[in-house]
């Protein structure tokens, strides 16, 4: 009897992925890496294959796709709503106040040097749920010694689900 994947271009090693609901080949992983890099500039390490499988397996279930190839074809057809969910699935939302503590004294020193010269705009490009921009705001208050500093902070994140929180 022929295997159900015979003739589908599924590598034998991928077929033997014991305990997995979906076949996930090295070619599928490379395709995911290429798509997420081209769409969002996210560079996935080759060591992230298991993480990618677990996060995208949920997307396959929710979109009723039987294979990663079918799911990736959906993206390639330009389904913008699914692209958003794809990106949200593959971003990591590690966040905390003053998460990279060595950056904040440098920011405070820089702010003190330019204090009074003009208004200051700060862009926090990976804001997650907000702890990073709040840490920046606390650093601004500490550097200027008041709450009326001429500073505006814009916070953004690729993951739209964390921005909604």
Describe every region a protein language model picked out.
Residues 2-125:
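Conserved AdoMet
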Residues 118-165:
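Class I S-adenosyl-L-methionine-dependent methyltransferase module
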């Amino acid at each position: 009897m022929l295997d159900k994947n015979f003739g589908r271009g599924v590598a034998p090693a991928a077929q033997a992925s014991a305990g997995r609901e979906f076949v996930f080949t090295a070619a599928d992983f490379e395709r995911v890496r290429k798509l997420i890099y081209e769409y969002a500039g996210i560079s996935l390490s080759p060591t992230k294959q298991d993480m990618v499988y677990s996060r995208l397996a949920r997307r396959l279930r929710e979109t009723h796709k039987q294979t990663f190839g079918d799911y990736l074809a959906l993206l390639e057809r330009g389904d913008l709503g699914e692209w958003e969910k794809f990106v949200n699935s593959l971003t990591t939302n590690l966040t905390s106040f003053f998460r990279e503590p060595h950056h904040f004294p440098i920011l405070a020193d820089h702010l003190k040097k330019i204090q009074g010269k003009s208004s200051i705009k700060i862009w926090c490009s990976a804001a997650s749920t907000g702890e990073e921009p709040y840490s920046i705001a606390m650093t601004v208050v500490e550097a200027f010694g008041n709450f009326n500093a001429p500073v505006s902070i814009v916070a953004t994140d690729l993951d739209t689900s964390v921005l909604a929180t």
